[in-house]
């Protein structure tokens, strides 16, 4: 009896430790995969969202905006080096997804900016957002919330991109 209870508790603890998973979405010839956001500290007014968008069609499309109940505004931003200084700016005219290509929204690059957060984004939770594309139209997407410093889905905070397979001595 005690052993069975221990096994059940250990199994539940294992599943509780797994990262939140979000489902992929499709609209027209666009596939949105691995949508996720970083958790935010209490009182934060902005948050960031990330995903991959693959265009399997023959014509380009553009991510032109979106909306969500967790923030007042949804903006598409880019981070870019300018004379040795990292700068963030809104993307004007939308983010192009060329035919046969995948565009990744990730920390330090293109990302969706959630401005005027109405609630804290808590690790392990999810939120819905509606993405709007110039040609494909609107699609509802479920975002999994990862840790505050996550660099990609399923990573611990502070992990540097591409460093996961390095052996440290």
Where are these regions (language model features)?
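Sec/Tat signal peptide C-region and signal peptidase I cleavage site
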Residues: 18-22
């Amino acid at each position: 009896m005690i052993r069975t209870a221990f096994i059940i508790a250990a199994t539940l603890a294992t599943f509780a430790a797994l990262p939140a998973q979000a489902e992929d979405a499709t609209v027209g010839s666009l596939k949105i995969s691995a949508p996720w956001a970083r958790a935010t500290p209490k009182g934060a007014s902005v948050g960031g969202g990330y995903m991959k968008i693959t265009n399997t069609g023959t014509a380009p499309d553009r991510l032109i905006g979106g909306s969500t109940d967790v923030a007042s505004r949804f903006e598409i931003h880019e981070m870019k080096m300018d004379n040795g200084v990292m700068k963030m700016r809104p993307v004007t005219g939308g983010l192009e997804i060329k035919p046969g290509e995948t565009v990744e929204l990730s920390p330090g690059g293109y990302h969706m900016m959630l401005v005027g957060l109405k609630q804290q984004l808590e690790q392990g939770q999810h939120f819905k957002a509606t993405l709007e594309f110039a040609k494909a139209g609107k699609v509802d997407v479920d975002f999994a919330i990862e840790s505050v410093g996550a660099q990609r889905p399923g990573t611990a905070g502070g992990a540097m991109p591409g460093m996961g397979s390095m052996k440290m001595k």
